[in-house]
C-alpha cells in the first residue's frame, strides 16, 4: 500500500470527527479526508531539471449550527488536531450570518451503490525510470527534424489519490484514483522565425498512455507545422475549433449552466431550461460512471448519487449543474454536481476533422487560444488565436496574431458540425466543432 492510511482507517477518522462535531454542538456536519502522493521529473536538453516528490493529506470539516456554517481544515490527523479543528469550525459558525440555504443535501439523495470505476492503477516508477522516459520523449522530439533546435523540456508525472467523504446522515464512502502523464514542449526555427508547441498524454492507467517517443514526435510535428505563420485578412469566416480547444468552447456552456453562476445572476443562460441553445442535431450528455475516466464517481462532493442524464437534448436545455446549495437558491433539486460536472459527451455529426474541413471549404482552423476575453455574464467572446487557414477544404498555411470574436449564444446556435475525434485523455469527450461564421481580425 502506498498510502499512510488504509481506507478503513480514513473511514474511522471521518466517523470520529463527525461525532466530535455533534458533541461540540453542531446540528449537522460533513467531513472529507484525503491523501495524495506522487512524483514529477523534468528534463531539458538531456539534463535533469527538476525532481519533485509530493505527499499530502488533509481534513476539511464543515459544521452547521442551525443555519450558520463554519469550516476548518488541517493536515494533522492526531486526536488533538481533530478536536481543535472541529472547535475552530464551530467557533466560525457561531459568528457567521444565518443562511436559509445552508445545510447538508437531503438524506434520501445519498448514494447507495458505490462500485469500482477502475480509476486506481498504481505506477511503481523509480525516479531513474521516470528520468529515462522523459529523456526518451524529448530525444524523440529533437530527432524528428533539424529545425527542432531547442526544447522547453519533457516531464513525467505520477499521482495517487484517496478520498473519504462522510456526513451526519450516516453516509460515508471511500474512493481512490490515479493520474499519470507524460509531456513535451519544443521550439523550431527557420528563416521566418521561431515557433513552439507541445503534446502530452495522461491516463488513470499508465499502460493506456501513448509511448513517450510518440508523444515527443507529436510535439515536434505540431511545432514544425506552425513555422512560417502569417496573419489573415479581417473578415467574417467559418471557424473550426480543433478538439484541443473545442473542450474549452463547450466549457463556457457548462459554466453558464452551473448553479453558482445562475443564482448569482452572472450567466448569459439564466432561465434557459426548456430553451434551445444548440442546434437540434446536438445533445450533451453527462455520464458519471464511465470506467477509467478522471471525473467518474458514484457520488458528488455532498454524497449525492450521480446519474447519467441529458444536460442538453436535441439542442434544448434539460438541466443545470447544481449542488444542494445552488439548487436551494434557485428553488430546484440538486443534480449531483457538487464539485463539478462528470464526463460530458457531445454527439458527433462527422467522422473526422477532415470531413469538417471539406464542409467548411474556406475558413479558419483554430488550434490555440490565448487571453481571457470571455464575458460569461453577457456571452461576449473575443480571444487571440492561432491555427491554420483553410482553402477548398485543405489546410493552406499556418496563421497567428489574429483575434476571433462573436457572441456565445450565436456561436452555439451556429454550430454546423462536430467531428468524432475527441481525445481519449479528456474526461469531456468533445470533438472538433465547426461554427458557421465568426469575426476574424487579422491584418
Predicted regions and their residues:
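Active-site bordering "gate/hinge" segments
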Residues: 1-297, 301-304, 313-314, 394, ...
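Dual-mode signal for accessory low-complexity, basic/Gly-rich regions
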Residues: 114, 270-443
Amino acid at each position: 500500500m502506498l498510502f499512510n492510511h488504509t481506507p478503513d482507517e480514513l473511514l474511522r477518522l471521518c466517523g470520529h470527527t463527525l461525532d466530535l462535531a455533534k458533541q461540540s454542538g453542531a446540528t449537522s456536519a460533513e467531513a472529507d479526508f484525503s491523501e495524495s502522493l506522487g512524483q514529477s521529473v523534468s528534463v531539458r536538453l538531456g539534463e535533469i531539471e527538476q525532481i519533485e516528490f509530493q505527499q499530502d493529506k488533509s481534513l476539511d470539516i464543515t459544521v452547521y449550527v442551525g443555519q450558520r456554517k463554519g469550516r476548518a481544515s488541517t493536515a494533522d490527523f492526531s486526536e488533538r488536531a481533530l478536536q481543535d479543528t472541529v472547535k475552530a469550525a464551530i467557533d466560525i459558525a457561531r459568528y457567521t450570518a444565518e443562511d436559509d440555504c445552508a445545510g447538508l443535501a437531503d438524506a434520501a439523495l445519498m448514494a447507495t451503490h458505490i462500485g469500482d470505476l477502475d480509476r486506481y492503477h498504481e505506477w511503481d516508477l523509480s525516479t531513474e525510470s521516470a528520468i529515462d522516459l522523459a529523456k526518451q520523449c524529448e530525444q524523440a522530439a529533437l530527432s524528428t527534424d533539424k529545425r527542432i533546435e531547442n526544447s522547453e523540456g519533457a516531464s513525467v508525472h505520477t499521482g495517487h489519490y484517496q478520498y473519504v467523504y462522510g456526513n451526519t446522515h450516516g453516509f460515508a464512502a471511500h474512493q481512490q484514483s490515479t493520474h499519470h502523464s507524460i509531456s513535451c514542449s519544443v521550439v523550431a526555427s527557420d528563416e521566418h522565425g521561431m515557433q513552439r508547441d507541445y503534446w502530452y498524454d495522461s491516463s488513470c492507467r499508465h499502460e493506456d498512455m501513448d509511448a513517450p517517443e510518440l508523444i515527443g514526435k507529436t510535439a515536434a510535428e505540431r511545432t514544425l507545422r506552425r513555422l512560417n505563420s502569417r496573419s489573415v485578412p479581417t473578415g467574417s469566416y467559418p471557424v473550426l475549433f480543433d478538439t484541443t480547444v473545442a473542450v474549452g468552447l463547450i466549457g463556457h456552456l457548462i459554466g453558464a449552466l452551473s448553479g453558482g453562476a445562475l443564482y448569482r445572476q452572472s450567466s448569459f443562460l439564466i432561465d434557459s431550461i426548456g430553451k434551445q441553445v444548440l442546434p437540434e442535431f446536438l445533445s450533451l450528455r453527462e455520464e458519471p460512471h464511465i470506467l477509467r475516466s478522471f471525473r467518474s464517481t458514484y457520488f458528488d462532493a455532498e454524497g449525492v448519487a450521480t446519474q447519467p442524464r441529458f444536460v442538453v437534448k436535441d439542442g434544448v436545455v434539460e438541466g443545470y449543474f447544481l449542488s444542494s446549495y445552488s439548487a436551494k437558491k434557485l428553488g430546484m433539486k440538486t443534480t449531483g454536481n457538487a464539485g463539478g460536472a462528470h464526463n460530458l459527451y457531445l454527439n458527433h455529426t462527422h467522422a473526422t476533422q477532415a470531413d469538417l474541413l471539406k464542409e467548411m471549404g474556406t475558413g479558419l482552423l483554430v488550434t490555440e487560444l490565448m487571453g481571457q476575453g470571455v464575458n460569461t455574464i453577457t456571452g461576449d467572446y473575443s480571444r487571440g488565436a492561432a491555427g491554420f487557414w483553410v482553402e477548398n477544404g485543405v489546410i493552406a498555411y499556418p496563421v497567428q496574431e489574429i483575434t476571433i470574436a462573436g457572441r456565445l449564444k450565436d456561436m452555439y446556435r451556429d454550430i454546423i458540425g462536430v467531428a468524432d475525434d475527441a481525445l481519449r485523455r479528456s474526461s469531456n469527450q468533445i470533438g472538433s466543432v465547426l461554427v458557421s461564421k465568426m469575426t476574424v481580425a487579422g491584418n
